[in-house]
Curated annotation (Swiss-Prot):
Any one GO biological process: negative regulation of BMP signaling pathway
Protein family (similarity comment): Belongs to the PP2C family.
Annotated residues for binding of Mn(2+) 2: 60, 239, 282
Primary enzyme class: hydrolase
Reactions the enzyme catalyzes: O-phospho-L-seryl-[protein] + H2O = L-seryl-[protein] + phosphate; O-phospho-L-threonyl-[protein] + H2O = L-threonyl-[protein] + phosphate
Any Gene Ontology CC annotation: nucleus
UniProt-listed Enzyme Commission number(s): 3.1.3.16
A Pfam family hit: PP2C_C
Species of origin: Homo sapiens (Human)
The protein's name in its UniProt record: Protein phosphatase 1A
Keywords: Cytoplasm, Hydrolase, Lipoprotein, Magnesium, Manganese, Membrane, Metal-binding, Myristate, Nucleus, Phosphoprotein, Protein phosphatase
Length: 382
């Protein structure tokens, strides 16, 4: 859903921080979409005796940004302040936390519905949500919709959330039981996710509870015991990222970037840029959370990266010189490079992850190019 721009908006919003033995960075980009509907939350050290806990989440809005923005500001409070989460005196148990997360989602969804109807009529926007609540002993993965989170442990994808799509058999059964249908893999032929916050037009079937509606606000929650030796990093991202990169691809790419820089904002920016150049047409947001045992910068990897960049610079110069009269356009350069067996390209990112390096050399050698010929579109690029 949503209209597209003539050129992508590539300006990024960044943030980073550290605490509780964690480091995080994030990046978000509007991309080709007419509006930016993503939002995010990053909190290290929670109030009310949970100073050693942290919370991170990505919200992918649709049909507007209102629900995503409200959730990024208030969902955490709804989770930690309800009685199911607090339980009895002392630190909440695993079951307290899981029940509290579920209750928090249902409460904020109902609160937004009532608030929307009172203020200005029903808000038709909605949002997916993917997040992690990290305690000293556990990582709680939270998912509602088709954004995704994964845990990289011991250099492999150890866990990833499951997308809530209407075509999923259990989701489809609930939709049909509520009187709906799944057409072209969408709820009633329209909405591409089967669980979300907001989307109140899909939550008005009389006689059905909130988790039995066409679209459910109920999250899936998984608790994973932390492993100090093996846990490396967590990635949370909206579907604008996952549309063009698989779980293993993104895990490998991030790991390779962490071996050449400890700047987590830079790593996230590279993820977003690479996904844009791989053809993503959606808003893009990614949060990278690193545990103490995350990959460290390797002098050997840094050297190989510099050698690769130098090689690409030389090849771009050669391609342009070989053309003779008339400078080839950037698409021609990219296609030529894509046809070659270039060693040491970043795993998962491949040539797309080096587009900025290639373009910088191209622009330096061709400073008087016509901007109209230098499209950022990736359609049929290579």
């Amino acid at each position: 859903m949503g209209a597209f721009l003539d050129k992508p908006k590539m300006e990024k919003h960044n943030a980073q921080g550290q605490g509780n033995g964690l480091r995080y960075g994030l990046s978000s980009m509007q991309g080709w979409r007419v509006e930016m509907e993503d939002a995010h939350t990053a909190v290290i050290g929670l109030p009310s005796g949970l100073e050693s806990w942290s919370f991170f989440a990505v919200y992918d809005g649709h049909a507007g940004s209102q629900v995503a923005k409200y959730c990024c500001e208030h969902l955490l409070d709804h989770i930690t302040n309800n009685q199911d989460f607090k339980g009895s005196a002392g630190a909440p148990s695993v079951e307290n936390v899981k029940n509290g997360i579920r209750t928090g989602f249902l409460e904020i969804d109902e609160h937004m519905r009532v608030m929307s109807e009172k203020k200005h009529g029903a808000d038709r926007s909605g949002s997916t949500a993917v997040g992690v609540l990290i305690s000293p002993q556990h990582t709680y993965f939270i998912n509602c919709g088709d954004s995704r989170g994964l845990l990289c442990r011991n250099r492999k994808v150890h866990f990833f959330t499951q997308d809530h799509k209407p075509s999923n058999p259990l989701e489809k059964e609930r939709i049909q039981n509520a009187g709906g249908s799944v057409m072209i893999q969408r709820v009633n032929g329209s909405l591409a996710v089967s669980r979300a916050l907001g989307d109140f037009d899909y939550k008005c079937v009389h006689g059905k509870g909130p988790t039995e509606q066409l679209v459910s606000p109920e999250p899936e929650v998984h608790d994973i015991e932390r492993s100090e030796e093996d846990d490396q990093f967590i990635i949370l991202a909206c579907d604008g990222i996952w549309d063009v990169m698989g779980n293993e691809e993104l895990c490998d790419f991030v790991r390779s970037r962490l071996e050449v820089t400890d700047d987590l904002e830079k790593v996230c920016n590279e993820v977003v840029d690479t996904c844009l150049y791989k053809g993503s047409r959606d808003n893009m947001s990614v949060i990278l959370i690193c545990f103490p045992n995350a990959p460290k910068v390797s002098p050997e990897a840094v050297k190989k990266e510099a050698e690769l960049d130098k090689y690409l610079e030389c090849r771009v110069e050669e391609i342009i010189k070989k053309q003779g009269e008339g400078v080839p356009d950037l698409v021609h350069v990219m296609r030529t490079l894509a046809s070659e067996n270039i060693p040491s390209l970043p795993p998962g990112g491949e040539l797309a992850s080096k587009r900025n390096v290639i373009e910088a050399v191209y622009n330096r050698l061709n400073p008087y190019k016509n901007d109209d010929t230098d499209s950022t579109s990736t359609d049929d690029m290579w």
